[in-house]
């Protein structure tokens, strides 16, 4: 059985284990520089997200299998992107750091996490979900396009884990 729920403090170690596996796989198979151990995402990032109520986890048959951070408002690094709809920060949210444990891959759990984010957005009355994806992260690009996100623009954005790099901005209008 699959469920998406808000994370609680006892989830932290399992979440870190999932993301460590994802980072290892990224570096081994794809070469993408999206995330780096000790840089992003870190235990402190997930701890802060749990405390803020913005970390969500996916459970498969009672075991944690995925995670994502959803924050209200559009990320300021997106600048003046040509979004499909005009909306105030209170009417939008951004999906960050969505990841599925490599041990449970190929079951559509990434799409199910996005569906959970869409359901949360509808519940909160948000008008759009937005996100950025590093241009060489082909698995994430496929996931978001398959889930109904629309490409908006490519922006050079600086993150500690990547330095300045091209990110593709996507939007899902609710």
Residue ranges and their predicted role:
Residues 1-13:
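Conserved N-terminal entry element of GNAT/NAT acetyltransferase domains
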Residues 87, 127, 134-138, 146-147, ...:
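C-terminal "cap" of GNAT-fold acetyltransferases
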Residues 3, 23-45:
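Conserved GNAT-fold acetyl-CoA-binding loop/helix
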């Amino acid at each position: 059985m699959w469920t998406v729920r808000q994370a609680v403090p006892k989830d932290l170690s399992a979440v870190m284990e999932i993301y460590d596996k994802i980072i290892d796989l990224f570096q081994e198979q794809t070469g993408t520089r999206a995330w780096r151990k000790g840089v992003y995402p870190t235990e402190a990032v997930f701890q802060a997200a749990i405390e803020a109520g913005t970390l969500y986890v996916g459970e498969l048959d009672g075991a944690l299998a995925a995670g994502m951070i959803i924050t209200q408002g559009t990320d300021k690094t997106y600048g003046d992107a040509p979004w499909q709809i005009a909306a105030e920060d209170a009417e939008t949210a951004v999906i960050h750091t969505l990841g599925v444990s490599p041990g449970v891959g190929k079951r559509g759990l990434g799409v199910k996490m996005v569906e959970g984010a869409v359901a949360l957005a509808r519940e909160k009355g948000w008008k759009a979900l937005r996100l950025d994806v590093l241009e060489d992260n082909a698995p994430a690009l496929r996931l978001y396009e398959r889930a109904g996100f629309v490409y908006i623009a490519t922006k050079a954005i600086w993150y500690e884990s990547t330095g300045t790099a091209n990110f593709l901005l996507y939007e899902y209008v609710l």
